[in-house]
Amino acid sequence: MLIPIPALNDNYIWVYKRENLSVIVIDIPEIAALSQFIQAQNLVIGALLITHNHRDHIGALAEFKQFYPHVHIYGPAECADQGVTQVIDAGRLIIDEYHIDVLPTGGHTAQHLSFLVDGHLFCGDTLFSAGCGRVFTGDYSQMFTSLQLLKSLPDETIVCPAHEYTLGNLAFALTTGKNKSAVQKQLEKVKKLRAENNPSLPTTLALEKQINPFLQVEGLEEFIELRKAKDMF
């Protein structure tokens, strides 16, 4: 089971569950929608994974701890003072038979993490469909390296970003002139999905390699130029 629960204006709380196991939750911008879903489905949360320390990803962390006081919360050191119970930076977590690869994907924030679970990539604000996160650190090299790391994963990887930014990202991607036919085709598909209030996510790494200009750059200089252009778009 893979469910994107809408939160705030354009966030998703991702919920992942393998049969007969507990639920893994990624990021917690608000509590109500998640708790209602967990209760309605009679589920047990095995862990909360935090990608980074922005308020739209940890805003309900304190409430989460009140609702689920025994659930371990894993996240980067930048979230240590926000209520994360287990600070991590890389490596592998084993939680209730889940093997979770922790990937350092800094750039949006310095210690941003992504999580790979059973071929599902929960990448927070590093990689979006047809886009990538803003480089608030100013460290474009770090962000470029993070995106190259994610790009190196298998094509069949299911990509689960934290925001519904796809329409705007595709509009920008069209202006870059990169693989315009694939971008236009995906734009029409996403317009229909969003018109019916359906999420455009998840996506796949194979598709992102076709439509995401930030995965098509040939080097750091081109990435910096493209990211700054998107900032002004």
UniProtKB/Swiss-Prot annotation:
Zn(2+) 1 binds at H52, H54, H108, D125. Binds 2 Zn(2+) ions per subunit. Pathway: Secondary metabolite metabolism; methylglyoxal degradation; (R)-lactate from methylglyoxal: step 2/2. It catalyses: an S-(2-hydroxyacyl)glutathione + H2O = a 2-hydroxy carboxylate + glutathione + H(+). It holds the Pfam family Lactamase_B. Zn(2+) 2 binds at D56, H57, D125, H163. One of its GO terms (molecular function) is metal ion binding. Its EC number is 3.1.2.6. Its cofactor is Zn(2+). InterPro entries: Clx_II_MBL (IPR035680), Glyoxalase_II_hydrolase (IPR050110), HAGH_C (IPR032282), Hydroxyacylglutathione_Hdrlase (IPR017782), Metallo-B-lactamas (IPR001279), RibonucZ/Hydroxyglut_hydro (IPR036866). Thiolesterase that catalyzes the hydrolysis of S-D-lactoyl-glutathione to form glutathione and D-lactic acid. Monomer. Belongs to the metallo-beta-lactamase superfamily. Glyoxalase II family. This is Hydroxyacylglutathione hydrolase. It comes from Histophilus somni (strain 2336) (Haemophilus somnus). The lineage of its organism: Bacteria, Pseudomonadati, Pseudomonadota, Gammaproteobacteria, Pasteurellales.
